């Protein structure tokens, strides 16, 4: 029977899909060599198939690169996507992980932050550790590339594609901002203290790309603890509050006099939205 044009198209699609799966499998079977954020070279005979992640942004990066099925354990704060919620063992936090629980999972690699104190102990037990810590927009793009390489996912189909989606989303958000909101002076509180997001933080970069001004200068560091009087003097147009700051919503002295409070210009993020805004990851 002579193939119809429709059948030819279906055959071509099937062949392309098969070739794509073959190439992906070959990439994952190749030796892997990367350098983590400690400057350490990590070499593996093949792409890791069993991964423990101790940092939510790295958990999300693995999943956004469509490799969530390789995760065998995560930290207690990894709560996205649904594929990891209640379905994977929790092995403690990034700073206080259960070494015994991690070892029992027999991971090919453990992903964690540079600041984690678990690196040396895990490596002493013979586990491979990759320490990555995105802190800026540029870091997010770079770390996505490293994770893509580690997973054997070609960057063109993995990290580069994902970054274009992220970047386009930020641009779209900036363009949707009402003209009267441009150059508004914003204070973003990440947790009680108050601890604020400065201009040099990941959040500060996001605010700048949206076209608003951060009242906390870069000279104070990425997440400085401020005297509440500092914020009163800054008198921001808008106050943004992360979920951690809502744990004890006791008014700070003098804040009732601020413009943002008087005019009820408060943006309070719930748990899910707060994670998206605060975590320097692919969401």
What positions do the PLM features span?
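Extracytoplasmic substrate-binding proteins
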Residues: 41, 109, 117-195, 213-218, ...
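Sec-dependent N-terminal signal peptides
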Residues: 8-19
């Amino acid at each position: 029977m002579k193939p119809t044009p429709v059948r030819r198209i279906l055959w071509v699609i099937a062949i392309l899909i098969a070739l794509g799966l073959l190439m992906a499998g070959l990439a994952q079977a190749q030796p892997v060599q990367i350098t983590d954020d400690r400057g350490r070279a990590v070499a593996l005979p093949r792409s890791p198939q069993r991964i423990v992640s101790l940092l939510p942004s790295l958990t999300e990066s693995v999943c956004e690169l469509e490799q969530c099925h390789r995760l065998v354990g995560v930290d207690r704060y990894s709560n996205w996507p649904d594929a990891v919620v209640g379905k994977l063992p929790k092995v403690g936090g990034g700073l206080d992980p259960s070494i015994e629980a991690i070892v029992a999972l027999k991971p090919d690699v453990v992903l964690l932050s540079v600041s984690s104190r678990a690196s040396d102990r895990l490596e002493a037990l013979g586990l491979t550790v990759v320490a990555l810590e995105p802190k800026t927009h540029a870091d997010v793009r770079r770390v996505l590339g490293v994770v893509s390489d580690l997973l054997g996912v070609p960057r063109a189909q993995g990290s580069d594609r994902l970054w274009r989606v992220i970047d386009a989303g930020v641009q779209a958000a900036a363009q949707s901002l009402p003209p009267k909101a441009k150059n508004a002076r914003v204070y973003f509180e990440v947790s009680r203290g108050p601890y604020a997001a400065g201009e040099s933080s990941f959040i500060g970069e996001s605010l700048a790309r949206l076209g608003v001004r951060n009242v906390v200068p870069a000279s104070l560091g990425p997440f400085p603890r401020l005297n509440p009087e500092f914020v009163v003097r800054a008198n921001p147009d808008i106050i943004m509050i992360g979920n951690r700051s809502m744990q004890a919503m006791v008014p700070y002295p003098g804040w009732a006099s601020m413009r943002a409070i008087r005019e009820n210009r408060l943006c309070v993020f719930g748990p899910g939205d707060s994670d998206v805004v605060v975590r320097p990851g692919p969401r």
